[in-house]
Amino acid sequence: MSMVSEFKKFALKGNVMDLAVGVIIGGAFATITKSLVEDVIMPIVAFIAGGEINFKNMFLILGDTPEGVVMTYDALKAAGVPVLAYGNFITVLINFLILAFIIFMMVKMVNRLRRADEVVEKIAGPSEEVQLLREISAKLGNINK
């Protein structure tokens, strides 16, 4: 089998295609989550806290600062000053927690739907094949008596 045909067989398997779709949707979903945190949640947190909270400007300078450099994260990074950006980490952590919670809720909903389908199957009773076999068994039982 050639390398190209082997790759085609691998790439066209259902699981690989499902994974590719999941990765693409996951990337888009991460962008939505980032916007939710930065554009919706953080302004509400800032309002409740009584002022503007900009986590990006929460950092710790680890080295010497050159003369005339503005003390903002972007300016310090541009000047090559080592900076511990714990504020950015907080933002990324909030993004992750929201994303993890949403995915947890989605999995929980899918599991609930699967259980509901299983209950419907159990309530529906035996399949036609089982009913037919029971009828045949009953008739054979009557013949043998």
UniProtKB/Swiss-Prot annotation:
It is a multi-pass membrane protein. It is found in: Cell inner membrane. Coiled coil: none annotated. InterPro entries: Mechanosensitive_channel_CS (IPR019823), MS_channel (IPR001185), MSC/AndL (IPR037673), MscL_channel (IPR036019). The keyword Lyase does not apply. GO terms for cellular component: plasma membrane. Signal peptide: none annotated. GO terms for molecular function: mechanosensitive monoatomic ion channel activity. Keywords: Cell inner membrane, Cell membrane, Ion channel, Ion transport, Membrane, Transmembrane, Transmembrane helix, Transport. The chain crosses the membrane at residues 10-30, 41-61, 87-107. The keyword Cell inner membrane applies. HAMAP family: MscL. Channel that opens in response to stretch forces in the membrane lipid bilayer. May participate in the regulation of osmotic pressure changes within the cell. Homopentamer. Belongs to the MscL family. This is Large-conductance mechanosensitive channel. It comes from Psychrobacter arcticus (strain DSM 17307 / VKM B-2377 / 273-4).
